[in-house]
Amino acid sequence: MELYQLTIHELQNKIRQGGVTSTAIVNSVFGRIDAVEENVHSYITLMRESALEEAQKADEQIRTGEINALTGIPVALKDIYCTRGVRTTCGSLILDNFIPPYDATVVVKLREAGAVFTGKTNMDEFAMGSSTETSYYGFTRNPWDLERIPGGSSGGSAAAVAADECIAALGSDTGGSIRQPAALCGVVGMKPTYGRVSRFGLIAFASSLDQIGPFTKDVEDCAILLNVIAGYDLRDSTSVPVDVPDYRDYLNRGIEGWTVGIPKEYFIEGIDPEVRGAIEQAIRTVEGLGARCREISLPHTDYCVAVYYIIAPAEASSNLARYDGVKYGFRAADCRDLLDMYKKTRSAGFGTEVKRRVMLGTYSLSSGYYDAYYKKASQVRGLIKRDFEEALKDCNVILTPTTPTPAFTIGEKTDDPMQMYLSDIFTISANLAGIPGISVPCGYTQSGLPVGIQFLAGHFEEGKLLQIASAYERNAHIEKRRPIL
């Protein structure tokens, strides 16, 4: 087995035993990138030179016995985090030449833990999309079928982990942008509780929904990464001062005696039969571990998509108002005056989907429509949150499909925004409620496409998610396949 195929914890063991160097690991990963990146297109910007320098520093630390949580481990970053001295585009022309003067908090934490950054991964422009097709830099392909999408908006990170172009990666999740691509690419992806991980240095899409989380090859690696990135940050006003446990302590506890809720509203017409079959088998596996699965109701589920597509665009229209070509980023040429520069810069700098959502959000916030749309959506959001609070009083966790279908073909839904928006129908609710969720591989379709199962828990109960995800992963006996590239 090649080094690039291993997990964080497997590489950690080899490093501690003196059997491998960080330089060898990084060279192995970049060798893999050289072999498959042309087909997959996971990255916008590669950081090869700095990665090799960081690997050499890591090897010096290893020789002195100074080994941290991620020393020498190659990690990819979604191109939505500010990285000092490294271009950060958010998948958009309007930030094509933007080089931040500072690092996001998660970047600082990963660096302090010893991680080696391989590059900045592709994404839907400003995280607005479910397929990584709206990126200014071209679409990413699903490693399992190069004619299909990897999911979005963090499709580049998910594809990079699935294709072994990194050992792990970070993404962001506003309505499912970690969990959905994780499911479609056959990897583990977690959205932590809102406020668990600092958003300082994350380029905002919808500030009350965005959350940063990991993509990994297994659940143990997810716990390792979460240990590093979680925690309170004074620089983020939405960060919550809650103690961070050692998440690896939850991995071997089992779930005997647990109650697992199965929301009836998530098993609706339109779910692909093979996805339904994989989820039903997963439920049987969970029951075999000593848990009791019972049907529950989340009565306001039908409103989730509508509420999300009022609140998220409204917040986006405000957040994206800062991109005007004045101080940084793309600036249109041949402008008559300041207003003309604003208009031409934003018209040319933003893609179609971003402009669609900005216009939608501006409309819902406008005078005469605020009460009818944004205020009402915010009220229904409160009801959705209460649904989860009531359900989780009687359940340890909730189990659902991550996506209604496997990965669809490239271009299949680009002309039908509503169909694209429905790709996140099972993931949006967790963002609206602010609760954590994790997607874990639970099988494959007959054509070999991955299927994911989602677990949801109460606020700051990531430990429970890792506990059931780890128990399921160990006992489901899902065949360990790798995409052929």
Swiss-Prot record:
Pfam families from the UniProt entry: Amidase
SUPFAM superfamilies: Amidase signature (AS) enzymes (SSF75304)
GO MF annotation, one: ATP binding
Keywords of this entry: ATP-binding, Ligase, Nucleotide-binding, Protein biosynthesis
Keyword DNA repair belongs to the record: no
EC class (word): ligase
Active site: residue positions: K78, S153, S177
Keyword Ligase found: yes
UniProt-listed GO biological process terms: translation
Binding partners and assembly: Heterotrimer of A, B and C subunits.
HAMAP family in alphabetical order: GatA
Chain's role: Allows the formation of correctly charged Gln-tRNA(Gln) through the transamidation of misacylated Glu-tRNA(Gln) in organisms which lack glutaminyl-tRNA synthetase. The reaction takes place in the presence of glutamine and ATP through an activated gamma-phospho-Glu-tRNA(Gln).
Protein name: Glutamyl-tRNA(Gln) amidotransferase subunit A
UniProt source species: Syntrophus aciditrophicus (strain SB)
Gene name tied to this protein: gatA
